């Protein structure tokens, strides 16, 4: 290709050079500010997601038949989260995040009366939780597991629904519902997930470096209490407790409950070390406050779902019982100002670690390596590599 210049000489077009990394972007047109519409740093909003027990219960409504139907649909949605957690091999904290987001959605917007529409919303919530908490799964995995759940748990669908048609319906609505849910939440993905927070607050580093000076008898008992606390949260999140307290309060609630159970069943002299909660959580822990939360928790169980995981009479915990396992006494005047930051940089900036922590990491790495080797050997045993047939001699 060529072009004629004004002087009549024929010159060839030269290739346009590619801009370097230092090239400045083209000037924006007047009235358009790219930084306003798409800033370098997007700050997600944070809303208040803690409500009064009275308001949570009243949200069900006073119309008996409608309230029963709503609770029935809600229970199916919670069952859906648990079933897909098993089928898709999701983490516990993804399951708890799904339940937390579901209750927030229900409290603000309510849920449809049709169960299929409820599952549509639940599927969008599950995908959002999965993307927020861990690696996402292929869209086919969500669709297949969701449709199987519907066919197994809603008998009326079996006779009048084509499974392939159902899959296409859920595929079409998945992305739409996911966008809808994000917009309705105002992109507020600050889940304050207690199952995730407890792993961070009591991670290996803090256990071996921050908590090394705890009493030996407590250090032996605490891993068992911590495990029971994890189980407590996974079970408790099926009731709308996440609307009653934030993530850190939820963790303290579980540790107090499991500490009382340990005191009753194992060691009658058990007690958390002095200011154990004050030094680790950014909240004020008092017996009176948490006794009220346990009372509200019991009311939620009575008004919502009758589940096997319900604690029932075990939630009748008063302030004197809580006071018997915690020792948060201190300077009342400075109590608020001394509330701890669980991720205080001052505790870790030196970079020094205990030898026990290094040994712990080495043991964990070896365990993971051995596990990977065993799984690899199992796969090879199930699918042995076929040896190629011997070449036949040419005739």
UniProtKB/Swiss-Prot annotation:
GO terms for biological process: DNA-templated transcription; DNA-templated transcription termination; positive regulation of DNA-templated transcription, elongation; positive regulation of transcription by RNA polymerase II; sno(s)RNA transcription; transcription elongation by RNA polymerase II. One of its GO terms (cellular component) is nucleus. Keywords: Cell cycle, Nucleus, Phosphoprotein, Transcription, Transcription regulation. It is found in: Nucleus. Its main location: nucleus. Coiled coil: none annotated. Residues 1-31, 372-395 are annotated as: Disordered. The keyword Nucleotide-binding does not apply. GO terms for molecular function: cyclin-dependent protein serine/threonine kinase activator activity; cyclin-dependent protein serine/threonine kinase regulator activity. InterPro entries: Cyclin-like_sf. The modification Phosphoserine is found at residue 24. Belongs to the BUR kinase complex composed of SGV1/BUR1 and BUR2. Interacts with SGV1. Present with 2910 molecules/cell in log phase SD medium. Component of the BUR kinase complex involved in transcription regulation. This complex phosphorylates 'Ser-120' of the UBC2/RAD6 ubiquitin-conjugating enzyme (E2), leading to monoubiquitination of histone H2B, the localization of the PAF1 complex to the chromatin, and the silencing of telomeric-associated genes. Also required for histone H3 'Lys-4' trimethylation. May phosphorylate the 'Ser-5' of the RBP1 carboxy-terminal domain (CTD) repeats. Necessary for the recovery from pheromone-induced growth arrest in the cell cycle G1 phase. Also required for vegetative growth itself. This is Protein BUR2. It comes from Saccharomyces cerevisiae (strain ATCC 204508 / S288c) (Baker's yeast).
């Amino acid at each position: 290709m060529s072009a004629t210049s004004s002087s009549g000489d024929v010159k060839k077009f030269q290739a346009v050079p590619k801009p370097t990394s230092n090239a400045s972007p083209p000037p924006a047109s007047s009235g358009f500010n790219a930084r306003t519409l798409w800033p370098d740093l997007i700050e997600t909003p944070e809303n208040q997601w803690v409500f009064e027990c009275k308001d949570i219960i009243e949200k069900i409504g006073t119309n008996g038949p409608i309230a029963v139907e709503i609770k029935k649909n809600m229970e199916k949605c919670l069952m859906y989260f648990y079933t897909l957690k098993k089928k898709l091999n999701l983490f516990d904290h993804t399951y708890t995040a799904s339940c937390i987001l579901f209750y927030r959605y229900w409290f603000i917007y309510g849920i449809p009366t049709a169960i299929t529409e409820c599952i549509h919303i639940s599927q969008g919530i599950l995908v959002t939780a999965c993307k927020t908490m861990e690696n996402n799964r292929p869209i086919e995995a969500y669709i297949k597991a969701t449709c199987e759940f519907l066919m197994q748990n809603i008998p009326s669908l079996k006779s009048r629904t084509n499974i392939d048609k159902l899959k296409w319906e859920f595929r079409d609505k998945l992305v739409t519902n996911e966008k809808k849910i994000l917009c309705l939440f105002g992109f507020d993905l600050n889940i304050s997930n207690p199952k995730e927070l407890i792993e961070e607050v009591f991670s290996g580093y803090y256990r071996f470096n921050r908590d090394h000076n705890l009493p030996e008898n407590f250090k032996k008992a605490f891993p068992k209490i911590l495990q029971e606390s994890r189980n407590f949260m996974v079970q408790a999140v099926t009731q709308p407790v996440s609307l009653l307290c934030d993530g850190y309060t939820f963790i303290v609630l579980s540790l107090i409950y499991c500490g009382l159970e340990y005191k009753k069943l194992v060691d009658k002299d058990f007690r958390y070390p002095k200011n154990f909660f004050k030094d680790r959580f950014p909240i004020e822990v008092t017996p009176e406050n948490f006794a009220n939360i346990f009372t509200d928790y019991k009311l939620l169980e009575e008004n919502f779902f009758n589940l096997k995981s319900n604690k029932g009479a075990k939630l009748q915990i008063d302030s004197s019982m809580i006071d018997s396992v915690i020792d948060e006494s201190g300077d009342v005047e400075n109590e608020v100002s001394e509330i701890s930051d669980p991720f205080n940089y001052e505790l870790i900036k030196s970079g020094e670690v205990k030898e026990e922590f290094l040994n712990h990491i080495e043991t964990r790495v070896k365990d993971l390596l051995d596990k990977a080797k065993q799984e690899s050997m199992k796969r090879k045993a199930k699918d042995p590599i076929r040896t190629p047939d011997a070449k036949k001699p040419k005739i």
